């Protein structure tokens, strides 16, 4: 079952929906430090927000780390006020051939309507911008000035999005 990306504004005041999207490089340095920072942030969101929608892709190490950290925090803290949502740029063969497994791992799977209509080379950036536009908070793990995650961070900055770059956070 493919669910198209909803065209909704940031959050949803009627049910106090707080939307967070995540973007990072395919490979990340200091994975344990980043995981600790993610866990602290996710824990705080689960405890302080009425309902949290965690939007992620499936494009590399950072996405996998976010997904596993969200799932772990939901089990340990509470799982009744959040959804882990995989947002695909288009219906991939991997998804279509393993749909049941995807739906068992993620609370929701969406295909971004805007990016599904684009050429595959621009679909990821279109999906990323759509995710930024619907988010209350955009979390990055970007430590170099190139790549799709960096381009998305530049877009989020220009859009005046509320952003955190976990690579910049100091203790």
Where do the protein language model's features map onto the residues?
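Short, Lys/Arg-enriched N-terminal segments with co-localized hydrophobic residues
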Residues: 1-14
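Acidic/glycine-enriched connector segments
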Residues: 11, 15-170
């Amino acid at each position: 079952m493919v669910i198209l990306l909803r065209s909704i504004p940031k959050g949803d005041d009627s049910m106090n929906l707080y939307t967070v999207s995540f973007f990072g490089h395919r490979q990340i340095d200091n994975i344990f430090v980043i995981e600790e920072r993610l866990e602290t942030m996710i824990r705080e969101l689960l405890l302080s927000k009425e309902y949290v929608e965690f939007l992620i892709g499936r494009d590399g190490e950072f996405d996998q780390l976010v997904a596993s950290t969200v799932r772990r925090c939901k089990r340990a803290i509470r799982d009744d006020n959040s959804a882990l949502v995989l947002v695909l740029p288009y219906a991939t063969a991997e998804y279509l051939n393993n749909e049941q497994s995807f739906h068992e791992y993620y609370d929701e799977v969406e295909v971004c309507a805007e990016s599904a209509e684009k050429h595959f080379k621009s679909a990821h950036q279109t999906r990323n911008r759509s995710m930024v536009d619907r988010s209350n908070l955009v979390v990055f793990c970007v430590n170099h000035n190139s790549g799709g995650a960096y381009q998305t961070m530049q877009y989020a900055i220009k859009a005046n999005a509320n952003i955190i770059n976990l690579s910049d956070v100091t203790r």
